[in-house]
Protein backbone atom coordinates (compact mmCIF):
# COMPACT_ATOMS: atom_id res chain seq x y z
CA UNK A 1 0.00 0.00 0.00
CA UNK A 2 1.52 3.39 -0.98
CA UNK A 3 2.09 6.14 1.57
CA UNK A 4 -0.67 8.75 1.65
CA UNK A 5 -0.28 12.21 0.17
CA UNK A 6 -0.69 15.27 2.37
CA UNK A 7 -2.48 18.51 1.48
CA UNK A 8 -1.70 21.34 3.90
CA UNK A 9 -4.20 24.18 3.79
CA UNK A 10 -2.60 27.25 5.36
CA UNK A 11 -4.21 30.53 6.38
CA UNK A 12 -3.38 33.50 8.60
CA UNK A 13 -6.31 34.70 10.73
CA UNK A 14 -7.04 37.31 13.39
CA UNK A 15 -5.90 36.16 16.81
CA UNK A 16 -9.17 36.69 18.66
CA UNK A 17 -11.88 34.52 20.26
CA UNK A 18 -14.16 34.70 17.20
CA UNK A 19 -11.52 32.90 15.10
CA UNK A 20 -11.32 29.99 17.51
CA UNK A 21 -15.09 29.79 17.74
CA UNK A 22 -15.22 29.51 13.94
CA UNK A 23 -12.41 26.94 13.95
CA UNK A 24 -14.45 24.81 16.36
CA UNK A 25 -17.74 25.18 14.50
CA UNK A 26 -16.75 25.27 10.81
CA UNK A 27 -13.80 22.85 11.01
CA UNK A 28 -15.84 19.72 11.86
CA UNK A 29 -18.30 20.46 9.04
CA UNK A 30 -15.45 20.73 6.52
CA UNK A 31 -14.02 17.43 7.77
CA UNK A 32 -17.39 15.68 7.43
CA UNK A 33 -17.82 16.92 3.86
CA UNK A 34 -14.26 15.84 3.05
CA UNK A 35 -14.98 12.35 4.43
CA UNK A 36 -17.51 11.76 1.65
CA UNK A 37 -14.62 10.80 -0.63
CA UNK A 38 -13.23 7.23 -0.31
CA UNK A 39 -9.69 8.46 -1.01
CA UNK A 40 -9.64 10.46 2.24
CA UNK A 41 -7.67 8.71 5.00
CA UNK A 42 -7.55 11.25 7.84
CA UNK A 43 -6.69 14.75 9.03
CA UNK A 44 -4.60 16.65 11.57
CA UNK A 45 -5.42 20.34 12.04
CA UNK A 46 -3.07 22.71 13.85
CA UNK A 47 -2.70 26.23 15.11
CA UNK A 48 0.74 27.81 15.29
CA UNK A 49 1.70 28.73 18.84
CA UNK A 50 5.26 29.99 18.35
CA UNK A 51 8.61 29.83 16.57
CA UNK A 52 11.83 28.09 17.58
CA UNK A 53 14.34 30.91 18.25
CA UNK A 54 17.34 28.68 17.29
CA UNK A 55 19.56 30.30 19.88
CA UNK A 56 19.37 33.96 18.87
CA UNK A 57 19.00 33.44 15.11
CA UNK A 58 15.37 34.55 15.46
CA UNK A 59 15.85 36.51 18.66
CA UNK A 60 12.42 38.09 18.61
CA UNK A 61 10.70 34.71 18.50
CA UNK A 62 9.33 32.71 21.42
CA UNK A 63 8.18 29.14 21.87
CA UNK A 64 4.71 30.43 22.78
CA UNK A 65 3.54 33.67 21.16
CA UNK A 66 -0.21 33.06 21.37
CA UNK A 67 -0.81 35.95 23.78
CA UNK A 68 1.21 38.61 21.93
CA UNK A 69 0.76 37.87 18.23
CA UNK A 70 -2.01 39.75 16.40
CA UNK A 71 -2.55 36.85 13.99
CA UNK A 72 -2.70 33.07 14.24
CA UNK A 73 -1.68 30.65 11.50
CA UNK A 74 -3.89 27.63 10.92
CA UNK A 75 -2.40 24.60 9.13
CA UNK A 76 -4.90 21.90 8.23
CA UNK A 77 -3.44 18.59 7.05
CA UNK A 78 -5.61 16.18 5.07
CA UNK A 79 -4.29 12.77 3.99
CA UNK A 80 -5.18 11.02 0.72
CA UNK A 81 -4.56 7.74 -1.06
CA UNK A 82 -3.66 9.83 -4.12
CA UNK A 83 -3.31 13.58 -4.60
CA UNK A 84 -5.89 13.39 -7.41
CA UNK A 85 -8.44 12.25 -4.80
CA UNK A 86 -7.98 15.61 -3.07
CA UNK A 87 -8.74 17.53 -6.25
CA UNK A 88 -11.71 15.32 -7.11
CA UNK A 89 -13.20 15.73 -3.63
CA UNK A 90 -13.06 19.51 -3.93
CA UNK A 91 -14.85 19.51 -7.27
CA UNK A 92 -17.51 17.04 -6.16
CA UNK A 93 -18.31 19.04 -3.00
CA UNK A 94 -17.37 22.53 -4.11
CA UNK A 95 -20.62 24.28 -3.19
CA UNK A 96 -20.40 23.03 0.42
CA UNK A 97 -16.68 23.69 0.81
CA UNK A 98 -16.70 27.17 -0.69
CA UNK A 99 -19.57 28.37 1.49
CA UNK A 100 -18.08 26.88 4.64
CA UNK A 101 -14.64 28.36 4.00
CA UNK A 102 -16.02 31.72 2.84
CA UNK A 103 -17.92 32.03 6.12
CA UNK A 104 -14.51 32.61 7.76
CA UNK A 105 -13.48 35.37 5.32
CA UNK A 106 -14.05 38.12 7.89
CA UNK A 107 -11.17 36.69 9.96
CA UNK A 108 -8.76 36.14 7.05
CA UNK A 109 -5.44 37.99 6.86
CA UNK A 110 -3.67 35.70 4.36
CA UNK A 111 -4.55 32.53 2.48
CA UNK A 112 -5.80 29.98 1.86
CA UNK A 113 -2.74 28.38 0.29
CA UNK A 114 -2.68 24.60 -0.15
CA UNK A 115 0.54 22.85 -1.24
CA UNK A 116 0.43 19.08 -1.70
CA UNK A 117 3.24 16.78 -0.55
CA UNK A 118 4.37 13.20 -0.89
CA UNK A 119 5.66 11.49 2.25
CA UNK A 120 9.22 10.33 1.51
CA UNK A 121 10.04 9.24 5.08
CA UNK A 122 7.79 8.46 8.01
CA UNK A 123 8.19 7.19 11.55
CA UNK A 124 4.78 8.06 12.95
CA UNK A 125 3.33 5.77 15.63
CA UNK A 126 -0.40 5.62 16.22
CA UNK A 127 -1.79 8.05 18.79
CA UNK A 128 -2.56 6.62 22.21
CA UNK A 129 -4.06 7.90 25.44
CA UNK A 130 -2.70 6.76 28.79
CA UNK A 131 -5.69 4.43 29.08
CA UNK A 132 -4.57 2.65 25.89
CA UNK A 133 -1.04 2.04 27.11
CA UNK A 134 -1.72 -0.92 29.39
CA UNK A 135 -3.87 -2.55 26.71
CA UNK A 136 -1.09 -2.26 24.10
CA UNK A 137 1.57 -3.66 26.44
CA UNK A 138 -0.78 -6.35 27.79
CA UNK A 139 -1.61 -7.55 24.28
CA UNK A 140 2.08 -7.91 23.44
CA UNK A 141 2.70 -9.79 26.68
CA UNK A 142 -0.22 -12.16 26.05
CA UNK A 143 1.05 -12.86 22.52
CA UNK A 144 4.57 -13.52 23.78
CA UNK A 145 6.00 -10.64 21.74
CA UNK A 146 9.03 -8.59 22.84
CA UNK A 147 7.94 -5.78 25.12
CA UNK A 148 9.25 -2.81 23.16
CA UNK A 149 7.62 0.03 25.06
CA UNK A 150 5.69 2.20 22.57
CA UNK A 151 5.80 5.98 22.82
CA UNK A 152 2.69 7.62 24.22
CA UNK A 153 1.72 10.09 21.51
CA UNK A 154 -1.37 11.68 22.99
CA UNK A 155 -3.89 13.27 20.60
CA UNK A 156 -6.07 16.38 20.71
CA UNK A 157 -3.72 19.16 21.70
CA UNK A 158 -1.54 17.20 24.13
CA UNK A 159 1.71 17.39 22.12
CA UNK A 160 3.51 19.83 19.82
CA UNK A 161 4.93 19.76 16.29
CA UNK A 162 8.11 21.26 14.87
CA UNK A 163 7.11 22.36 11.35
CA UNK A 164 10.49 22.94 9.71
CA UNK A 165 10.55 24.69 6.32
CA UNK A 166 13.41 23.97 3.90
CA UNK A 167 14.18 25.02 0.30
CA UNK A 168 16.94 22.99 -1.37
CA UNK A 169 19.57 23.99 -3.94
CA UNK A 170 18.69 22.41 -7.33
CA UNK A 171 20.68 19.20 -7.79
CA UNK A 172 21.18 18.64 -4.05
CA UNK A 173 17.79 17.08 -3.31
CA UNK A 174 19.18 13.55 -2.77
CA UNK A 175 21.92 14.86 -0.46
CA UNK A 176 19.28 16.70 1.57
CA UNK A 177 16.96 13.70 1.77
CA UNK A 178 19.73 11.31 2.83
CA UNK A 179 21.08 13.68 5.47
CA UNK A 180 17.71 14.68 6.92
CA UNK A 181 16.64 11.05 7.33
CA UNK A 182 19.89 10.25 9.18
CA UNK A 183 19.31 13.32 11.35
CA UNK A 184 15.81 12.18 12.28
CA UNK A 185 16.97 8.64 13.03
CA UNK A 186 19.46 10.09 15.52
CA UNK A 187 16.81 12.37 17.04
CA UNK A 188 14.76 9.30 18.03
CA UNK A 189 16.87 8.98 21.18
CA UNK A 190 15.92 12.44 22.47
CA UNK A 191 13.51 12.51 25.44
CA UNK A 192 9.98 13.32 24.35
CA UNK A 193 10.47 12.45 20.65
CA UNK A 194 7.16 11.13 19.28
CA UNK A 195 7.75 10.68 15.56
CA UNK A 196 8.69 12.42 12.34
CA UNK A 197 8.05 12.57 8.62
CA UNK A 198 9.62 14.32 5.63
CA UNK A 199 7.20 15.91 3.17
CA UNK A 200 8.31 16.75 -0.39
CA UNK A 201 6.15 19.28 -2.22
CA UNK A 202 4.76 18.08 -5.56
CA UNK A 203 2.66 21.16 -6.37
CA UNK A 204 -0.18 23.38 -5.18
CA UNK A 205 -3.93 22.87 -5.34
CA UNK A 206 -5.48 25.79 -7.22
CA UNK A 207 -9.00 24.96 -6.10
CA UNK A 208 -7.88 24.50 -2.47
CA UNK A 209 -6.07 27.86 -2.67
CA UNK A 210 -9.05 29.61 -4.33
CA UNK A 211 -7.01 30.61 -7.38
CA UNK A 212 -9.55 30.93 -10.21
CA UNK A 213 -8.06 33.30 -12.77
CA UNK A 214 -9.51 36.74 -13.53
CA UNK A 215 -13.13 35.65 -13.88
CA UNK A 216 -13.16 33.70 -10.63
CA UNK A 217 -11.25 36.44 -8.80
CA UNK A 218 -14.00 38.94 -9.51
CA UNK A 219 -16.75 36.42 -8.76
CA UNK A 220 -15.33 35.88 -5.27
CA UNK A 221 -15.13 39.62 -4.59
CA UNK A 222 -18.55 40.47 -5.98
CA UNK A 223 -20.70 37.75 -4.46
CA UNK A 224 -22.13 37.61 -0.92
CA UNK A 225 -20.69 34.16 -0.21
CA UNK A 226 -23.77 32.26 -1.33
CA UNK A 227 -22.67 31.92 -4.98
CA UNK A 228 -19.51 29.90 -5.52
CA UNK A 229 -17.12 30.61 -8.41
CA UNK A 230 -16.81 27.97 -11.11
CA UNK A 231 -14.08 25.52 -9.98
CA UNK A 232 -13.26 24.85 -13.63
CA UNK A 233 -11.77 28.36 -13.81
CA UNK A 234 -8.63 27.14 -12.02
CA UNK A 235 -5.80 28.03 -14.41
CA UNK A 236 -3.25 25.35 -13.50
CA UNK A 237 -2.92 21.74 -12.40
CA UNK A 238 -1.23 20.66 -9.16
CA UNK A 239 2.08 19.59 -10.80
CA UNK A 240 2.27 22.83 -12.82
CA UNK A 241 2.46 24.79 -9.56
CA UNK A 242 5.43 22.87 -8.13
CA UNK A 243 7.93 25.29 -6.61
CA UNK A 244 11.53 25.62 -7.73
CA UNK A 245 13.77 25.23 -5.79
CA UNK A 246 12.31 22.10 -4.21
CA UNK A 247 10.36 22.70 -0.99
CA UNK A 248 10.33 20.27 1.95
CA UNK A 249 8.58 20.23 5.31
CA UNK A 250 10.22 18.24 8.10
CA UNK A 251 7.43 17.44 10.57
CA UNK A 252 8.71 16.35 14.01
CA UNK A 253 6.40 15.64 16.96
CA UNK A 254 7.34 16.12 20.62
CA UNK A 255 5.69 15.56 23.99
CA UNK A 256 5.84 19.27 24.94
CA UNK A 257 7.62 22.52 24.08
CA UNK A 258 10.57 21.80 26.39
CA UNK A 259 11.16 18.45 24.67
CA UNK A 260 10.94 20.20 21.30
CA UNK A 261 13.37 22.97 22.24
CA UNK A 262 16.04 20.72 23.75
CA UNK A 263 15.45 17.92 21.24
CA UNK A 264 15.80 20.10 18.15
CA UNK A 265 18.69 21.83 19.91
CA UNK A 266 20.68 18.62 19.63
CA UNK A 267 21.55 19.58 16.03
CA UNK A 268 23.60 22.41 17.57
CA UNK A 269 24.91 20.78 20.76
CA UNK A 270 25.47 17.05 20.11
CA UNK A 271 28.68 16.79 18.03
CA UNK A 272 27.82 13.63 16.06
CA UNK A 273 24.31 14.84 15.27
CA UNK A 274 25.57 18.32 14.47
CA UNK A 275 27.97 16.85 11.90
CA UNK A 276 25.13 15.00 10.15
CA UNK A 277 22.78 17.99 10.27
CA UNK A 278 25.51 20.23 8.84
CA UNK A 279 25.18 18.14 5.67
CA UNK A 280 21.53 19.26 5.57
CA UNK A 281 22.49 22.92 6.05
CA UNK A 282 24.92 22.78 3.13
CA UNK A 283 22.05 21.96 0.74
CA UNK A 284 19.75 24.84 1.63
CA UNK A 285 18.61 27.94 -0.19
CA UNK A 286 16.33 28.75 2.75
CA UNK A 287 15.81 27.38 6.23
CA UNK A 288 15.46 25.68 8.50
CA UNK A 289 12.67 27.91 9.78
CA UNK A 290 10.74 26.07 12.47
CA UNK A 291 7.16 26.94 13.38
CA UNK A 292 5.73 25.35 16.53
CA UNK A 293 2.27 23.89 16.07
CA UNK A 294 -0.36 22.40 18.35
CA UNK A 295 -2.61 19.71 16.79
CA UNK A 296 -6.04 20.74 18.07
CA UNK A 297 -8.36 18.61 15.95
CA UNK A 298 -7.50 15.17 14.54
CA UNK A 299 -8.78 12.18 12.67
CA UNK A 300 -5.94 9.92 13.79
CA UNK A 301 -6.90 6.99 11.55
CA UNK A 302 -4.45 8.24 8.89
CA UNK A 303 -1.68 6.86 11.09
CA UNK A 304 -3.26 3.42 10.98
CA UNK A 305 -3.33 3.64 7.17
CA UNK A 306 0.30 4.81 7.09
CA UNK A 307 1.48 2.02 9.39
CA UNK A 308 -0.18 -0.68 7.29
CA UNK A 309 2.67 -0.32 4.76
UniProtKB/Swiss-Prot annotation:
An annotated Gene Ontology molecular function: metal ion binding
Cofactor: Fe cation
List of residues binding Fe cation: 86, 90, 114
Annotated InterPro entries: Dimeric_a/b-barrel (IPR011008), S_Oase_red (IPR011661)
Induction notes from the record: Aerobically induced.
Keywords: Cytoplasm, Iron, Metal-binding, Oxidoreductase
Source superkingdom: Archaea
Textual note on the cofactor: Binds 1 Fe cation per subunit.
Transmembrane segments: none
Pfam family, one: SOR
NCBIfam families the UniProt entry points to: SulOxRed
The protein's assembly and partners: Homoicosatetramer. The resulting structure is a hollow sphere where catalysis takes place in the inside cavity.
Listed name of the protein: Sulfur oxygenase/reductase
Species this chain originates from: Acidianus ambivalens (Desulfurolobus ambivalens)
Amino acid sequence: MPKPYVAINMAELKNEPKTFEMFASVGPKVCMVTARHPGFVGFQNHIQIGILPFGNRYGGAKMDMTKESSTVRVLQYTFWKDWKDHEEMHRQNWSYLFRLCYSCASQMIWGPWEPIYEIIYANMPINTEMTDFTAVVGKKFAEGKPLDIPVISQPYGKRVVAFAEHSVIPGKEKQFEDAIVRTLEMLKKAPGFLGAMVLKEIGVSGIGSMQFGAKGFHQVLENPGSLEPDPNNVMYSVPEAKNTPQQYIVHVEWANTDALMFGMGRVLLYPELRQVHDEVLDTLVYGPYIRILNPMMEGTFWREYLNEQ
